């Protein structure tokens, strides 16, 4: 069978069971639901408007997942969200949760990305963008589980600014690389640690970017900061790499 297209939806529970493999289930309007239930089947999900879900959502379809098609699209998961899909995940817009967990694997950006939890832990794998010059803002503050963990960011280019704020701890599990666009920068607010040897690289052909880190907690891994001719600011009182080393190249 072909794609399933759904217009504006307001429902207690939306359950997606199965389609023929590689077919699309497309929500072209806004979605409001208490529960949104998916199955581990080979269909693709497209949510092309704003969406609000009262309960926790787990995306477990084995096809692709597309959340949004414009920067203004907002997805509010009041019970948190977990992404366990088997295909490509593309986010265009904002992900919001009220004091609940936000968990994604690797994601691709079609627009700028904003991820905010009012106190819940945020975990994201690698973040890439195939076009444009995208801005990333990730914030978990308030509450008691206000941590952020992210994989590599910008390895394929097209990432302009990265701003991460955590109330407790941000863990970097991969390198961060910004593109050669004016205004590119990396800003880490709160305490940061690195789960592996990490390089933050804003050194570009004609537009070097500033690196700002508020505080660092020892992980015994090495940290390399390369900003070309732009400033590196280590502003916090606490900057402890344990037995790891810090290498800086910049002003």
Would you name each region that the model predicts?
Residues 1-251:
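Extracellular lectin-like interaction modules
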